[in-house]
Amino acid sequence: MGNKSKHKGKYNTGSGRVPHGFKHAKSLGQNFLNDQNVIDDIVEGSEIDEQTLVVEIGPGEGALTTELIDAAGYVIAIELDDRLIPILRTKFALHDNFEVIHEDILKVDIKSIVDESMSAHGLTKTRIVGNLPYYITTPIITKLIESKARFESLTVMMQKEVGDRIAAEPGTKL
């Protein structure tokens, strides 16, 4: 990646951590990403730089978010779980290139968010990244495509079976 950001190391990690005993919400399909190699691959593969707006779907406890903030011009994290909102806001409070939106990705107006943020921050490209809940991966991807939002790439983690279905030839039974 080679991009050293002005934001590196500005984290309030003490009170911005997921509390001990935090239970993932099965109803939300939560599976937090914490493998640094995978995180690095996502950031590198997304070709993010300081002219990039990143929209992160489902930031969870912010492991990927940390690297996105370091690489991007601006990061908007969209998180549904109200238990994680104060954790994310605390963890990244020292960053002027981050905001979290407490909303369901399937209900948010992604085109307006992208258009307004690109204009407000003078950014030239948009990347969408995320670790998607398995049971709503297809609806999320469909919504993003149908939204007409301007984004150059979509880099997501998904369950292998979902990826196989998306990549399958029409009419193939999986």
Language-model region placement:
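Catalytic cores of RNA-modifying enzymes
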Residues: 1-174
